[in-house]
Regions:
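Catalytic domains of carbohydrate-active enzymes, especially glycoside hydrolases
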Residues: 24-46, 101-109
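Hydrophobic faces of well-ordered beta-strands that scaffold small-molecule active sites
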Residues: 9-16, 40-42, 68-75, 110-112, ...
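Aromatic-lined substrate-binding rim segments of carbohydrate-active enzymes
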Residues: 50-72
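Acidic-and-aromatic substrate-binding clefts and catalytic sites of carbohydrate-active enzymes
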Residues: 18-23, 43-55, 78-91, 118-122, ...
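Alpha-helical scaffold elements within enzyme catalytic domains, especially in hydrolases
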Residues: 31-34, 58-62, 101-104, 138-142, ...
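Histidine-acidic metal/acid-base catalytic patches
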Residues: 2-10, 26-33, 161-176, 186-327
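Active-site acidic/histidine proton-transfer and metal-coordination neighborhood
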Residues: 3-5, 62-69, 81-177
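Alpha-helix N-cap and loop-to-helix initiation/capping positions
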Residues: 27, 50-58, 86-94, 123-134, ...
Length: 327
């Protein structure tokens, strides 16, 4: 098995990569330790099992015994997002509960999201950003008390880089930062390198995966692929991340499924992107023009758990080689 990455790079696993495993949090930790990573990113509460203090204490003790750092997260904290689950309490109540859990489990951050691409229509996304900023400001004192930072992800096509930057700066970069996802920018017709260049100063943690993008009659198609199989120059992205975000975790979020079509040749598509600068879209177009259709795969199998582990371990091996050659 590959050795651990160099000490100046904290390699991790986002457990969404293993979403079909039906493991306990302790089993997740043991698997990650066997993969010789340093960070385990519990991006959703379901991977922790519960926020019960006894459970969180057990997770913390096992992680410490295995020499692993822990990060935790939740889903939407925007009360007007289509993703938001109000049955779990107000957005503020949910965030405070997560900060308390972060202290118990030893996580320096709480990862959260605004929503998804569905929140861009009818929009405007700026209204959802304002609602999220309001929630964050309402928990500022609690974040200070708990010594926790909130890492907002560019998630599932919800925000472009300049929009997430605005959210962080309006909420307060002293306690709000970014969970930088390398795959999601393409869902917002954005070059991942542009996303990194725009947000690097606010990055607290990350989700890393490779992508393939290519032109088609409607516009472009995007699919997420194992590391090294895409055409977004993921090697350069990783090297740039290590340089611009020193010490920040580089956590694999392996997701491999069929392509998403971005029909930007249809005028209606642009209702979701009325303010996208041409210079930014041009960078996305350049990626698509260099791409070739990605070979079709069996995107879903009877044994999704095995498929997920195979894809993740392929990406981990590639990333370790890349990081070692970079460092």
């Amino acid at each position: 098995m590959d050795a651990r990455p160099p000490s100046n790079v904290k390699l991790g696993i986002d457990l969404f990569s293993l979403r079909s495993q039906k493991w306990t949090p302790i089993q997740f930790l043991e698997y990650c330790a066997a993969q010789k990573v340093q960070v385990v990113h519990f991006s959703e509460i379901r991977f922790l099992g519960s926020l019960n203090p006894e459970n969180l204490s057990a997770v913390r003790k096992r992680a410490e015994r295995l020499g692993l750092e822990v990060e935790i997260g939740t889903k939407s904290i925007c009360p007007t997002s289509k993703m938001f689950d109000g049955t779990a309490g107000t957005a503020e109540e949910q965030l405070i509960k997560m900060m308390e859990a972060a202290n118990l489990v030893g996580s320096p951050i709480v990862r959260a999201v605004l929503g998804s691409a569905d929140d861009r229509i009818p929009g405007p996304i700026e209204a959802r950003i304002e609602d999220t900023v309001r929630v964050l400001r309402n928990v500022r004192s609690q974040a200070a008390d708990h010594k926790i930072k909130i890492a907002i992800e560019n998630h599932a096509g919800d925000m472009q880089a300049r929009e997430l930057k605005m959210l962080v700066e309006e909420a307060g970069p002293d306690f709000v930062g970014v969970c930088l996802d390398s795959g999601n920018p393409l869902w917002t017709i954005e070059d991942p390198h542009l996303t990194l260049e725009t947000l690097h100063q606010y990055v607290l943690t990350s989700h890393l995966r490779d992508s393939a993008v290519w032109k088609m009659p409607q516009g472009a198609a995007v699919t997420w692929v194992p590391m090294g199989r895409g055409n977004v120059d993921i090697d350069s992205y990783v090297r740039k991340y290590i340089e611009l975000c020193p010490g920040r975790p580089l956590s694999l979020e392996s997701i491999v499924f069929g392509p998403r079509v971005l029909a930007y040749n249809d005028h209606a598509f642009w209702k979701a992107y009325p303010n996208t600068p041409a210079r930014e879209f041009q960078r996305f177009l350049a990626l698509a023009e260099r791409g070739q259709p990605y070979p079709a795969e069996p995107w879903k199998t009877p044994d999704e758990g095995t498929r997920e582990r195979k894809a993740l371990e392929e990406s981990l091996a590639y990333t370790k080689r890349l990081v070692n050659s970079t460092s």
